[in-house]
């Protein structure tokens, strides 16, 4: 690649994947498989979209020398985001929720082991994400702010609230405003948090950029949710890597709008996201470049 800035970002994404794959938590226990099961779903792959958003901000805002000095600490935070996201997927796949048998081209944990193990591993990954942040060697004020952002957006005011609404209203059609609220919380808030955490971890205090990243992340997250709803009805398990056609009685954008209108809505959101990103370029060209490259790669996989 001829672009040195993008090369730096892409290389860090690859190094993070290596960091993740070599990360191992040893449990002092005589449980026959809990240690293996703990990190299994994390290691089973995935796009690493949320950690890559976090790294996109850091690689753009922190000088390479300063970044290199803190690389391991940044990777701990990126891993914390991935752990919290993975816990949410494990619980979302449970029989009491989506009852999915496949995730990331592998059997879900409750399908491979049992429901109890899946619940406990989800609980463990949730709490481990905050252990990773608290054990970081970043400044104390940064650690506190990172914990605040992740807990607020991944907890009862964010992802958990969205999941609760999704489950409770499974057989009750919602209107567009309600559906948007649901998915802003269930999906978009953690995406938004990943961007905000990147800014906070950089040590740069920029309230205007913080608010922009928050709003941009919410819109981007909504766009990806609409695209995901479309995938559920248009792709099979082999194409998507997860159990599909589960949204028959759920509140999805396809069920509310129909496939054609949902596809148009996704295209509108995608255009708005890319246009918003272009407006960022004059003030933060490296950040715009990193995010644009990541989004274009991911959009290709969803459209």
Task: Write out the residue ranges for each language-model feature.
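All-alpha prenyltransferase/terpene-synthase fold signal
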Residues: 1-303
